[in-house]
């Protein structure tokens, strides 16, 4: 785990941790390998959908129902002043996740963003195809492509809100471009090393 994230989690204030990034960027892998082993609670809308439906959503309405329930669970933790993480593709156009970050700050939570990014939507599409081959859920290619730039636009806005942000370049995972391992970084303020590339992708 990034040292800065470890420090904020170990602090006295409750923490709202948003794990964001495009489809197939390995957000759930981050949760499973970094947060679950230390007992940090998290909400994954995909898992919530499985709990509610017994399968992955097939319609927009079903996906929205899982999203609403996920938000309800996060807000319950806000009320109880308990730390919580939420996974998100971070592509909504109405700013709901940004509003959650602001809501958490208003209620005295520390806010942290883990952004798991990749270079292109084609990497996301390849990852999702691999996930489907292994029994995971599918996401249409065009939906992945349309979400990709919105995800980075929301990242820009989130960086103005959160107390800490760490950006993870996961483009090389699974050997997509030569087998590089995922990298994460922060510069003391918590802003990741590939931030200039983020802005160039959305400018």
Task: Name each model-derived stretch.
Residues 59-62, 104, 129-132:
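Short, hinge-like loop/turn segments at secondary-structure boundaries
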Residues 47-49, 91, 117-123, 172-174:
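Conserved nucleotide-binding/hydrolysis micro-motifs of P-loop NTPases
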Residues 10, 14, 126-203:
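Conserved GTP-binding G-domain of TRAFAC-class P-loop NTPases and closely related GTPase folds
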Residues 40-42, 111-113, 165-167:
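Conserved beta-strand scaffold positions in the cores of enzyme catalytic domains, especially
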Residues 1-10:
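Pre-Walker A adenine-sensing motif
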Residues 65-115, 151:
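Glycine-rich phosphate-binding loop used to anchor ATP phosphates in small-molecule kinases
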